[in-house]
Amino acid sequence: MFAKRNETIGIFNTIPQGWTEISEAEYITLRNTPSVEVQREFKLKELKDRVNRLKVNNSEMYITSSLGFKVNADTNSLENVNTLIDLNANIFRDFDNKIHKVSLDDLKTIKSEIQQNTVNLYQQKWKYEEIIKKASISELKELKLNFEMLDFKQG
């Protein structure tokens, strides 16, 4: 007879106490399912890949600046803002491709907000890592890796 208890499966002559009888088909499916440790590694890799995709030129990686418009917040955008600061530029193109006249202080504000959002992204990643390290197989399957970007808008 085939049986399972929590995430453990086995074959028995009689079903031990605390175990539940399962069909041979379910046993085969469960036997071929990677262990919780392997599935945690898969989920951690998925998390790492998701964060890396967000950091590099990604349309999901934007913030609402305290200056009142959306700003791309990936690593390429941070580099672009640094260049604008170095050149003392007074024009900035936002997430929606609108042009804004800005001061050096405005650019420094944008830079700081992008940096704060990057820290926020990593803090969320670290929380997910802790969740994944403790999750069961069913919890791993249900876990969605969604990230919230910061909103610096006043009011």
What are these language model-derived features?
Residues F2-G155:
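A preference for well-ordered globular domain cores
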